[in-house]
Amino acid sequence: WENTLTYDRIFGKHTLGLMVSTTASQYSYRFNDATMRGFEDEINSMMYFSNGTQVINPNDLYYKDRNVSYVARGAYSYSDRYFFTASMRRDYASRLPRGKKYGDFPSVTAAWKITSEPWFKKNNVVSMLKLRASWGKIGNLGSIGYGYGVATLSTRYPNDSPDVGSQIGIDNRVMAGIFLANAFNPNLTWETSEQVDVGLDAVLFNNRLNLSVDFFNKNTKNLIKTQDVNWPTTIGIASPLINDGQVNNRGLEISALWKDRIGKDIGYYVSANVATLRNRLTNIGAANPDG
């Protein structure tokens, strides 16, 4: 489901564009599973589910996942020289814990088209030259599954899951039980990435060479991961998801496109690009006190 409202106006040397949008989606999931034993006749053609006498590991799982987004954006330019854009995005994810479901993610961009300045003299070398810069935040749900917000209770038989169950009674019979399968973290929140971009676009030599240079620096915080350390295995429950750690990605990308003609009937183009990327784990997160 999506709704969008836009407004555009040009007055003199000014250009204004406004947009508001809402999107919503829902995903429903249901899973039923069971194993049947105790068939009087073990011929394959007779081993229907209804002919069994002992149900093993019945499971019934149902959940809904909802996502809603609200976006507002405004763009302004003056005389094909100065360009500004600002936006705000508010996202809702039902799979996150109560009080952590919403995330706010702003962004801004600016550009300066130098060749549109009155003082810039037209020439055969530089046809267009533009500087760009932007900053923004985005959120993602990482490895959070659709059913994370659902409290999970499972019935397991040790014959199928050896790590579950207890031996009790005179004959040490292993009894089935109901247990909480996964720990839930009520403080789990959005994984966020904050990125800065600076770029240069140029069209040179009578529009034959297109050149673009981009530098970016991206910091991702509150990484969503399983709590692998400081979680005793004796608890008897799977470790929860947590926000922990920070990653930095920094890089430079250069792309070029050369277009020309040979005579009147033959045209050709050659493109190339080169990029560098440095990835660093700037914060490893919680450390194991035992090393």
Predicted segments with their positions:
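Extracellular/periplasmic, surface-exposed regions of secreted and cell-surface proteins
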Residues: 1-291
